[in-house]
Amino acid sequence: MPEQIHARVEACYQQAEAFFKQRFARPEISFKLRGQKAGVAHLTENKLRFNLQLYRANQEDFLRQTVPHEVAHMVAHQLFGPRIQPHGEEWQLIMRGVYELPPHRCHSYEVER
């Protein structure tokens, strides 16, 4: 299953590279994330973490929305620097312009407690 996430991350980077006409450094990908968060972008470490439990329960939406959401954070950081807002206009530009997705801040997955 993580192979699908790896493939989607790569596809998102390729979309961003075609859109912006520049290369982006690929992040380390980890699946050590639990709890309510579906994904986290560690910008200064160039690392993406994904929640496999939420992925397994929401595969289609996770690949369509969550993975691009996190990649958009990485791309925005590489393009615009560290002083931008996490879900600010730069990130929203990438979500809408590159991925043609609504810039939702949070997922609506059911989370077990």
List the predicted regions and their residue ranges.
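Active-site-proximal or metal-binding-adjacent scaffold patches in catalytic folds
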Residues: 1-65, 74-113
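Walker B catalytic acidic pair
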Residues: 70
